[in-house]
């Protein structure tokens, strides 16, 4: 059975390493990107099943890419993450999009990913 793939686009290195460690232990293949440009390349090349996308990145607002990402990957489960609650007002959760406030707890992760 193929491993599920997760892409984490976030410029906070500590957060990325904690998430990578968590998901690697769960049997996922994990890809990390610290910029939108790098993340979009990995998204297209590696075809992950799940995306964790931060909003405030060095090269732009991650959440502005949502429509483009959904258009090309309607099968992708997306978790939008931010430490800034006011950013959530512009996005509506759907079956495909989940919004989580940072810091993400292991309780949230365990409830979503077992």
Which residue ranges define each predicted feature?
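Active-site residues of response regulator receiver
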Residues: 54
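C-terminal output helix
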Residues: 104-113
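Short amphipathic alpha-helix used as the core "switch/output" element in two-component signaling
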Residues: 63-74
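The feature encodes the CheY-like receiver
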Residues: 58
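Two-component/phosphorelay signaling modules centered on CheY-like receiver
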Residues: 13-31, 97
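Acidic catalytic/metal-coordinating carboxylates
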Residues: 35, 61-64
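Acidic, metal-coordinating helix/loop segments flanking the phosphotransfer/catalytic sites
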Residues: 32-50
């Amino acid at each position: 059975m193929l491993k599920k793939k997760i892409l984490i686009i976030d410029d906070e290195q500590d957060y990325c390493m904690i998430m990578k460690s968590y998901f690697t232990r769960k049997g996922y293949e994990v890809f990390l990107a610290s910029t939108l440009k790098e993340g979009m390349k990995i998204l297209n090349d590696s075809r992950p099943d799940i995306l964790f996308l931060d909003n405030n990145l060095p090269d732009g607002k991650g959440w502005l890419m949502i429509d483009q990402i959904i258009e090309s990957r309607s099968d992708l489960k997306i978790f939008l993450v931010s430490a800034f609650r006011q950013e959530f007002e512009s996005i509506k959760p759907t079956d495909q999009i989940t919004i989580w406030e940072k810091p993400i707890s292991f309780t949230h992760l365990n409830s979503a990913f077992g």
